[in-house]
Amino acid sequence: MSTPRPPSSHPERRFRDAMAQFATGVTIIAAPLKPGQYVGFTANSFNSVSLDPPLIVWSLARHSRSLAAFESATRYAVSVLAQDQVALAHRFSRPHVDRFAGVDFRLGAAGAPLIEGAVAWLECRHHALHPAGDHMLFIGEVEACALRTAPPLVWHGGKYLAAAD
């Protein structure tokens, strides 16, 4: 039996700690800027919204340096990472690095990077953008998707974990 952690006295920290108990998958969301240049970041704020049409949602902080690039992108791709891709998750969450240098990826039909070795890939067209507090919600219509059978990478309690059966 686990021992409950004492709650933080700061409401924002308590909210973050509570949300950290919700296990999520880990993705890299990427878009083309211009030929040979791409923008991408690690995200766990990703979910399906609708089956008809197929829609997904993800969020990006309003203070993110890549916000303007994604706001102007008409297409992007979501790569759902495999449990052996922790290094990629770290790389795409760090500022001031060429995130795509040396990374094995291919371009989808609309030119967005698809990370090799991921467990799923979704190629999306921009559908809607909504402000939500200190983040922007991006809704994408899935134009193509593919998957492979492999264990996904999981984010829980502020750390990366392997999925359990």
List PLM regions with ranges.
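Basic, polyanion-binding surface patches
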Residues: 1-165
